[in-house]
Amino acid sequence: AEKLEPVLPLIV
């Protein structure tokens, strides 16, 4: 979730 896998926007 660090701009690698845009599935769960935790740190957007």
Swiss-Prot record:
* Superkingdom of the organism of origin: Archaea
Chain's role: This enzyme complex catalyzes an intermediate step in methanogenesis, the formation of methyl-coenzyme M and tetrahydromethanopterin from coenzyme M and N5-methyl-tetrahydromethanopterin.
| Reactions mediated catalytically | 5-methyl-5,6,7,8-tetrahydromethanopterin + coenzyme M + 2 Na(+)(in) = 5,6,7,8-tetrahydromethanopterin + methyl-coenzyme M + 2 Na(+)(out)
Q: Give the principal location in a single coarse category.
A: membrane
Gene Ontology biological process terms from the UniProt entry: methanogenesis; methylation
Q: What is this protein called?
A: Alternative tetrahydromethanopterin S-methyltransferase 28 kDa subunit
Assembly and partners?
Answer: Composed of six different subunits.
EC number, UniProt record = 7.2.1.4
Q: Name one GO molecular function term.
A: tetrahydromethanopterin S-methyltransferase activity
Enzyme group, top EC level?
translocase
Question: What's any one GO cellular component for it?
Answer: plasma membrane
What are the subcellular locations of this protein? Cell membrane
Membrane-related topology note: Multi-pass membrane protein
Provide the alphabetized UniProt keywords.
Cell membrane, Membrane, Methanogenesis, Methyltransferase, Transferase, Translocase, Transmembrane
